Amino acid sequence: VSWYAANEYCQAQGKKLPTVAQWEYVAQASETRKNGSSEKGYNQKILAWYGDSAKKPLTDIAQDKANFWGVHNMHGLIWEWTDDFNSNLVTGESRSDGSLNQGLFCGSGAAGAVDPSDYAAFMRYGFRSSLASKFALSSLGFRCAKAED
């Protein structure tokens, strides 16, 4: 599904694609805490998932345990579109790039990027690149977000 189709679908549901910050905030949660990174074993759990994922088939949607916010499958199932793409991690090199917006894209996924020493949090950042909003892939999806009531 393209970013445009995902965005239109969410709007038709009265929701929107989450921003990168919103996605990361929810992804940082463990099953019991808003910020799972302070929980013993959290980073190891994420690292183990990525280390073993190539050997295992993907799980069905919502078959894993929900995180603190009640959201399932925040890590590793597929790449996900986010609403915003103009972040400092994806803009062009401003000193020599005359067309900063030319290479921007919308795909995203991360555990969180609060602590640079938190290797698990940066693992999915490597996949936040080189995908224009008009493209669609079989491993690329989205989730819609709404304001908390």
For the regions a language model picked out, list residue spans one by one:
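Short, structured beta-strand segments at or near domain termini in extracellular proteins/domains
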Residues: 136-149
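Functional-site microenvironments in short loops/helix caps that host divalent-cation chemistry
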Residues: 1-126, 133
